[in-house]
Regions:
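ATP-binding glycine-rich loop module of kinase domains
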Residues: 7-55
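Flexible N-lobe loop architecture of eukaryotic-like protein kinase catalytic domains
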Residues: 55-61
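Short beta-strand micro-motifs within the conserved protein kinase catalytic domain, predominantly
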Residues: 63-74
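Structural motif in protein kinase domains
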Residues: 81-93
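Activation segment signature within eukaryotic-like protein kinase domains
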Residues: 108-109
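Protein kinase catalytic-loop region centered on the HRD/HxD motif
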Residues: 112-127
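Activation segment/activation loop of eukaryotic-type protein kinase catalytic domains
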Residues: 128-172
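C-terminal lobe helix-coil module of Hanks-type protein kinase domains
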Residues: 171-290
Length: 303
């Protein structure tokens, strides 16, 4: 595919590379991999990871069509489902372009926890390894599919510090700094936190401010008496901030499932989320700008 014929899919370029959408190939994401991950050694690691995982047909993971080299550019070509990257959804919500309701945010969070938990429950302790908002596709019915799973072993080979993983790739790592099921849980916690904040926290000091961000987390309208307290305890365990940390997403999922919420409110999430995803996919007109976006929500919570 000629890059001049391609359309940028993800406006938020990250340390993994640059994402493109191939208009001639259906729902195809082409990721031009960053130099750090596209060395000849890491190319072989990525190809091996693709072959290792592809044979299992894991429904949580979007299928990679191929890994190809064109001169100095290594590209990972992935078949993505209809939907919108979570990074795009949160960016739109942050700036008030769409109204991602509390019940829709909780529904996506629950779908994410369930999806990663199902992955971790499989034999052989499989991992994703690179859970960021750019690697989550949210579908109209609220289900999610994960991309970017080819990089787990390559990331391990880089020997980055926790701070470097964050600054370079936007990956929040546990104290062990190992790419494993616990790092998946920590990154899952960051995605859940981002959903309730309606933005992806950024900046070089995010790790240092996690405790403060968790303290302000709220499920909003779906909350009942103990919801927010239970949500903060869950996030604290995911981030190793207090209480026993989760060993994997199976444990995290069992605890998340016990968080009490307004069932009727969460049950209404699907039509709301369907509208938001269709708006972002160009199938419905954009709504009037939501005044204040995340800033107004934060001020309301503080008051």
């Amino acid at each position: 595919m000629e890059r001049s014929d391609a359309k940028r899919l993800d406006r938020r370029q990250d340390g993994f590379g640059t994402r493109w959408f191939d208009p001639k190939g259906g729902r195809i994401e082409v990721l031009d991999v960053s130099p750090a991950l596209s060395t000849p050694e890491n190319e072989q690691i990525i190809r091996s990871r693709m072959a290792e995982v592809a044979g299992h047909g894991l429904p949580a993971l979007a299928p990679v069509r191929r890994v190809e080299r064109n001169a100095q550019t290594l590209s990972v070509v992935t078949a993505t489902p209809a939907g919108v990257p979570l990074a795009e959804l949160l960016a739109a919500a942050e700036f008030g372009l769409v109204d991602l309701s509390d019940h829709a945010a909780f529904a996506v969070a629950r779908a994410l926890v369930t999806r990663v938990g199902a992955l971790h429950a499989l034999p052989g302790a499989p991992i994703h390894g690179a859970l960021t908002a750019a690697h989550v596709i949210v579908q109209r019915d609220g289900t999610v599919v994960l991309t970017g799973w080819t990089f787990a072993n390559a990331l391990s080979s880089l020997e980055r510090t926790r701070t470097q993983f964050w600054n370079e790739f936007g990956l929040v790592m546990p104290p062990s700094n190992q790419v494993d099921q616990q790092s998946d849980v920590t990154q899952l916690g960051f995605l859940v936190l981002s959903l309730f904040l309606r933005r992806v926290p950024c900046g070089r000091s995010v790790e240092a401010s996690l405790a403060d961000l968790v303290e302000g987390a709220s499920a909003g309208e779906v909350a009942v008496a103990s919801t927010d307290e239970a949500l903060r305890a869950w996030l604290s365990s995911a981030f190793h901030l207090g209480g026993p940390p989760f060993a994997n997403a199976v444990e995290a999922g069992l605890v998340f499932a016990d968080i009490s919420v307004d069932v009727e409110c969460v049950g209404s999430a699907r039509p709301s989320l369907d509208v938001v995803v269709r708006q972002m996919c160009g199938e419905l007109p954009w709504p009037p700008i939501v005044a204040g976006g995340a800033e107004a929500r934060a001020l309301a919570a503080a008051g």
